[in-house]
């Protein structure tokens, strides 16, 4: 059973990897300018000026322990540098039954598109010398060869975007449909902001979730296993549904902005390159 699950994960990772090159090639026009140091990367003295300690966590390398600081208390501390924090981008894509949905076979699921964008962005960041973290991973992914291990780790990500290992002032990029109640998302983003993180939120939806193109009697089923909801004339609800979605999206954008995150949307029937390039430009401007 475990071997079968591993094979499925490997196959998905390989499929994602096979789709990466076109995205990376088109986005390297932006990455080329990044390589020249446009955003002020501090190459000299990278590890000299540390400015923060955090408690040791399982999975941290012993070589990163600051024994002098640790000797002053009954806790073990990890030393982190300003350069390390500034160069770290933490990536997270939501999992769950709702993300595994698509309205028609010609489209990717929201999960597939989220993972595709996460890995494509990671490829660009790794090429530019950034340190990439996945929420829940014990250590950073560094160097272009780290893309495959990152893809393999995606099914093991933290269930919610929370990770006490992330260095203060790192940037976070979150991929999800963000259809949960606003207060739930607010709590998650507020916790990241309190940790010193800022970043970007990308809402990924299926086109049918925006337009509600159905007509007649429709029976909606909860992907999480809840009771089905039969609706006799779905077209009569289209306007109210779209208005509610617009209010939810406006709320997402407002709370993200209030906590130091930018907000953008993407549909699975749109080219992934559009979202990737816009997101990469935002990262380089942050």
Language model feature labels by segment:
Residues 1-45, 55-63, 69-71, 78-286:
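Exposed, interaction-prone extracellular/peripheral surfaces
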